Every structure is written in C-alpha cells, then in structure tokens.
Curated annotation (Swiss-Prot):
Family: Belongs to the radical SAM superfamily. Biotin synthase family.
Biological processes, Gene Ontology terms: biotin biosynthetic process
Matching InterPro entries: Aldolase_TIM, BATS_dom, Biotin_synth/BioAB, Biotin_synthase, Elp3/MiaA/NifB-like_rSAM, rSAM
Known cofactor(s): [4Fe-4S] cluster; [2Fe-2S] cluster
The Radical SAM core domain, residue ranges: 39-264
Binding-site positions, [2Fe-2S] cluster: 98, 130, 190, 262
Organism: Chlamydia pneumoniae
Gene3D superfamilies per UniProt: Aldolase class I (3.20.20.70)
Residues reported in the UniProt entry to bind [4Fe-4S] cluster: 54, 58, 61
Keywords per UniProt: 2Fe-2S, 4Fe-4S, Biotin biosynthesis, Iron, Iron-sulfur, Metal-binding, S-adenosyl-L-methionine, Transferase
The keyword Nucleotide-binding is annotated on this UniProt entry: no
Complexes and interactors: Homodimer.
Protein's recorded name: Biotin synthase
UniProt-recorded Gene Ontology molecular function terms: 2 iron, 2 sulfur cluster binding; 4 iron, 4 sulfur cluster binding; biotin synthase activity; iron ion binding
C-alpha cells in the first residue's frame, strides 16, 4: 500500500515543471513554509571513506577505474580518522554526516564491519548518518539499521531511458531493488539524480515521476549538477541552464512536500543569488565542506557568510523519525 496521499501522474509533474517560473517559485515556497520552518537549512558533510577504483562505468564519475582521471585509488579510511573528521564537521554545524564508498556493492567483510563501527561512533556524536555503499543485501541493511544508520543514499541518476546511455554495469532495476531493500529495513532513503548530463526536460520529469510513484517516498531528494571531469565521457558536456536547475528543485518541492530537497554536488557553480532563489524554491539542505567526494564544493567560510546573510538556521538532527515515510500532498 502506498504511503502518500496524492497519486502523481506524469502529466501532473510535467505541468508543474512547465509552470511560469515566478508562479512556480511562489507555489514551491508556500509548500516549503507549510511543512518546514522556512529559515531552517540542513547542513550535511560528506566523507569519502573509500575513494577510486570502482569497477562501474558511470559516465560522470571520476572514481571509475575505466577512465583516466585525476583520481588515484586510495585504501579505505581508518575508523578513528573518519570519526575525527565527523567530529570536526559537527563542530562546524553539520547535522548529518554522509559516508561514501566507491563500491558497486557492499561485501560481507572487514571493510563492511568497519563501516558499521563508523556509523555507531558518529551517531554517538549526535549526528544523523547516511551511507552510500552501492547495492545491499537485506542482511547488510539490517546490520546498518542495528548500527544506527539513519539514511541510505542510492540515486537513480535520471529517467530509465536516459540512464541506459550513461551506465551499463548496473541496471535501473538494480537500483530500484536496492531502494526496496533499504525501505524494508526501516532505514530512510535518500534518492535523487543528476542534472546537466545531456538529458532532456522530459528525463528530469520522468525521474521525479519514478520517485513519486514508489511505495516509499524518499526522505531526501538530492539534486546534483553535473561537474564535468576530465577523462570521463561527459568531460565536454556544456553546463545546464540555471533555470532548468531551479525548475527541477521547485518541482521536487511541490511533488515531495515533506522531503528534504538537497542542493547537492555542483552548488559551487551557482552564485549566492542563484542559491538564494533555490532556497526560495524549496531547497532546504546543502552539503557543507570544501570537497564532495572528488569534486569541489563551496568554501566553508563563504557558506557561513551566506547562511548568516540569509538568516538561515541549522536544522536539528533527527527531525524526522528514522524510516518514517513522507506523505505527499498538494496543500
């Protein structure tokens, strides 16, 4: 049984996406204010606990072993080093710490046990913990839940049709199955996509429709802007129009009124004025820190200045009960 109260059709979402920008921002902002404290901003900190050497062929990713990029494979980080970085992040104001590993899937080995220990230790710091480890088994998801994991990130990247043009080593169905495993475990899901890869407006609309018609609505919907990386197939991809980014964020807010909408990778491309429009249009979460996995992010001091200028305040950790579904509505 689906847990949201609105059955979104593809045409519904298409109509929202193509609403005149001023009206779309107004509608999205009203929905944000009716479901959240409008001045709250969730600040997330991302740690790459295992960088590079991935066997997959995601066309946008510097960590693929199939491409010649600036990334050199590194061994997995030690528990103490990850916890120390997480502690510093919390001191800087982060309320969620995300752990990313360049794996196709998690394996039942000492490295997975190391992740469990990291999750427990960082949760003890008072921060929500999110992991992105690739595909999971039900047993692994249960272990992560028992360790205290709050959320699991597993993006769909784009529409089913466009996805096939950027990734061949993992199917769309594989990704959907992983989301099902995570939902079954009681862990919240973080799932969104990447814009600016050469996809069409319709691909962005279809991605949101796939997420909106699942049995469980994502707790977080990250919107990433492609960061073209030398050596990857998308290295020469021209930038997407800011207005398309804004439409995607605003549409996500309307369709997922109680989810966090995260302005994620690629935010460094945007001016403070453009980011402000994104916040008005429904984004209420960002990544905090100078680097996101292998790409640049906004300077921490500049972010702090922007947050102060806009009068934003940190969103506390554990604002939504773990695994609690977000109910979509049109109010």
């Amino acid at each position: 049984m689906r847990e949201e109260t609105v059955s979104w059709s593809l045409e519904d979402i298409r109509e929202i996406y193509h609403t005149p920008v001023f009206e779309l921002i107004h509608k999205a902002n009203a929905i944000l204010r009716s479901n959240f404290l409008h001045s709250e901003l969730q600040t997330c900190y991302l740690i790459s606990i295992k960088t590079g050497g991935c066997v997959e062929d995601c066309a946008y990713c510097a960590q693929s072993s199939r491409y010649h990029t600036h990334v050199t494979p590194e061994p997995m980080m030690k528990i103490v080093d990850v916890v120390e970085r997480a502690k510093r992040a919390v001191e800087l104001g982060a309320t969620r710490v995300c752990l990313g590993a360049a794996w196709r899937n998690a394996k039942d080995d000492r490295y997975f046990d190391r992740v469990l220990a990291m999750v427990k230790s960082i949760t003890d710091l008072g921060a929500e913990v999110c992991c992105a480890l690739g595909m999971l088994s039900e047993e692994q998801a249960k272990k992560l839940y028992d360790a205290g994991l709050y959320a699991y990130n597993h993006n769909l990247d784009s529409s089913p049709e466009f996805y096939e043009t950027i990734i061949t080593t993992r199917s769309y169905e594989d990704r959907l199955n992983t989301l099902d495993v995570v939902n079954k475990s009681g862990i919240s899901t973080c799932c969104g996509g990447i814009v600016g890869m050469g996809e069409s407006e319709e691909d962005r609309i279809k991605l949101l429709h796939v997420l909106a018609t699942r049995d469980h609505i994502p707790e977080s919907v990250p919107v990433n802007l492609l960061w073209p990386i030398d050596g990857t197939p998308l290295q020469d991809q021209p930038p997407i129009s800011f207005w398309e980014v804004l439409r995607t964020i605003a549409t996500a807010r309307v369709v997922f009124p109680r989810s966090m909408v995260r302005l994620a990778a690629g935010r460094a491309f945007l001016t403070v004025e453009q980011q402000t429009l994104c916040f008005l249009a429904g984004a209420n979460s960002i990544f905090y820190g100078d680097k996101l996995l292998t790409v640049e992010n906004n300077d921490i001091d500049e972010d702090a200045e922007m947050i102060k200028l806009l009068g934003l305040i940190p969103r506390p950790s554990f604002g939504i009960e773990r695994g609690n579904p977000c109910y979509a509505n049109n109010s």
